[in-house]
Curated annotation (Swiss-Prot):
Key words of the record: Guanine-nucleotide releasing factor
Domain notes: The PRONE (plant-specific Rop nucleotide exchanger) domain is responsible for the GEF activity.
Matching Pfam families: PRONE
Tissues/organs with expression: Expressed in the vascular tissues of roots, leaves, sepals, petals and siliques.
Function: Guanine-nucleotide exchange factor (GEF) that acts as an activator of Rop (Rho of plants) GTPases by promoting the exchange of GDP for GTP.
Tree of life domain: Eukaryota
Name by which UniProt lists this protein: Rop guanine nucleotide exchange factor 2
Chain residue ranges for the region called Disordered: 1-36
UniProt-recorded Gene Ontology molecular function terms: guanyl-nucleotide exchange factor activity
Subunit structure: Interacts with ARC10/ROP11.
PRONE domain boundaries: 107-485
Organism name: Arabidopsis thaliana
Keyword rRNA-binding: no
């Protein structure tokens, strides 16, 4: 087995060397998921459309090569490995800072056994066949397969991680190695742009130049950075003043907070989250320093959550609306919204989505999600009617796009009001699960690049939300123990 370096230049993108023999054809794939929300996260937050699977996409990659078996055709530094000799001669501050962590992670990587190799071959075959092992050609498209693989990898690595504590070294290594394999497909997604080129005779010609697609070039490095920040956040919870006790397993010594924080945390949580471990703090509560550190980490992680959510919403917004979704829309928008909401939206007075939401008195996020589905369906129903009523030639449509006549169309006005209502609803419930349209877009999407970005941002969004919720648990227990509530 070859020697492992202590520090490498590329650990910021989550790459670690495998000392074992490598077969470039040996990969693995995720288990076949079902499009339903998973419930391994904290509280009632669901942003994934694949159930937890025991499988993951495992592979071993040579340190001196690119993420794929052949050299990457792009000059994209984020997705390409660099020379290790240079990094060893000129170690960076990042290398020195994470030297000990890297050494521990490398020591955890063992040679792949024969059963593991066979499992990897089987899973990779399943990935290539679009999750259809029968070979009958009924598998899903590549985009959906990769999206499911990322979702299932997240569930495998983080599904049992329900505490504020560092990931085990093997889990962290698996996550970084397998994500690099799944993300390496983006090395080969390009767009062509015109570029002027001067010839030797002085003439100027226009040629097409390839470059990484704009959405991947912008969003993928950002997601990698968010991923790294979340791993650092978990690693920071090594020596803490709080600890955990599983519900129902509290001993007499650990029940010193049962009369205060233990029961109140149960009340604060959803009843269906009974399996989550209970955070415990000293009788006098956390120290001021520990409390400030927790609040600071909560704020930074919350910003990561917002960034991942913004990227995910942007990618979903760029996906085409599937014809299958449009075919299921009712003929009337009123049938989707219901009589009460429709009367308020068609009233002659000034429409206020905030007042409408106050009148509806939504008591749960489940009700909010149902309302979002109905409002979104009515919005596209009215938009479709507005297009049919204002069908014109292409030139006239461009000329009169924002005309007063079109603005006064009833369907157009109702569609705008439905859009504003949906926007306010999502603002009031920022952790709302994905709507039926979002899930349909993911299921019908055939763009591999968008599938990678959407699934990667979605799982990071879920992880960030969980960390924030776990920190809130600890702060709530601390507040209760100090007698502030």
């Amino acid at each position: 087995m070859e020697n492992l370096p202590n520090h490498e230049e590329n650990d910021d993108v989550g790459y670690h060397q495998s000392p074992g023999p490598i077969d470039p054809n040996d990969h693995s794939a995720s288990e076949t998921p079902v499009y339903s929300t998973m419930s391994t996260d904290s509280f009632a937050y669901h942003r994934t459309c694949s159930e937890t699977s025991g499988g993951g996409f495992s592979d071993q990659i040579d340190e001196t090569s690119s993420f794929c078996t052949e050299a990457s055709p792009s000059d994209w530094p984020v997705l390409t490995e660099s020379n290790n000799s240079a990094s060893s001669n000129f170690p960076t501050v990042f290398d020195l800072k994470h030297n000990q962590i890297e050494t521990d992670e490398h020591l955890a990587v063992q040679e792949i056994s024969e059963p593991e190799l066979e499992t990897m071959k089987e899973r990779f075959s399943k990935l290539l066949l679009g999750e259809d092992m029968s070979g009958s050609g009924k598998g899903v498209c590549t985009a959906v397969t990769i999206s499911n693989a990322i979702t299932n990898l997240y569930a495998t690595v983080f599904g049992q991680n329900l505490r504020l504590e560092p990931l085990e070294i093997e889990q962290k290594t698996t996550w970084k190695r397998e994500m690099n394999c799944l993300l390496s497909v983006c090395d080969y997604i390009f767009e062509f742009i015109p570029k002027s080129q001067n010839l030797s005779n002085g003439a100027t010609v226009e040629v097409m130049e390839s470059r990484p697609r704009a959405d991947i070039y912008i969003n993928l490095p950002a997601l990698r950075k968010l991923d790294s920040m979340l791993m650092e956040a978990l690693d920071s919870f090594q020596k803490t003043e709080f600890w955990y006790a599983e519900e129902g397993s509290l001993s007499m010594k650990s029940t010193r907070s049962a009369t205060g924080s233990f029961r109140k945390v149960i009340v604060q949580r959803k009843e269906e989250k009974w399996w989550l471990p209970i955070p415990l703090v000293p009788l006098q509560g956390l120290s001021e320093k520990a409390r400030k550190q927790l609040k600071s980490k909560r704020e930074s992680t919350n910003q990561i959550h917002k960034a991942a959510m913004a990227i995910n919403s942007s990618i979903l917004g760029e996906m085409d609306i599937p014809d299958s979704y449009m075919a299921t829309l009712p003929k009337s928008g009123k049938a989707s919204t219901g009589d009460a909401i429709y009367r308020h939206m068609t009233s002659s007075g000034r429409f206020s989505p905030e007042k409408l939401l106050d009148r509806l008195k939504i008591v749960s996020e489940h009700e909010a999600l149902q309302l979002a589905d109905r409002v979104e369906a009515s919005m596209y129903t009215w938009r479709r009617k507005a297009c049919l009523n204002n069908s014109k030639s292409s030139w006239n449509m461009v000329k009169d796009l924002m005309s007063i006549t079109e603005r006064s169309d009833k369907n157009y006005v109702l569609a705008e009001r439905a859009e504003s209502l949906l926007f306010c609803l999502k603002q009031r419930y920022p952790e709302l699960s994905q709507t039926s349209l979002d899930i349909c877009k993911i299921h019908c999407n055939k763009d591999v690049g968008k599938a990678v970005l959407e699934s990667y941002s979605r799982v990071l969004e879920g992880l960030a939300f969980n960390i924030v919720a776990w920190i809130d648990d600890v702060l709530y227990v601390d507040k209760t123990m100090r007698g502030e509530e």
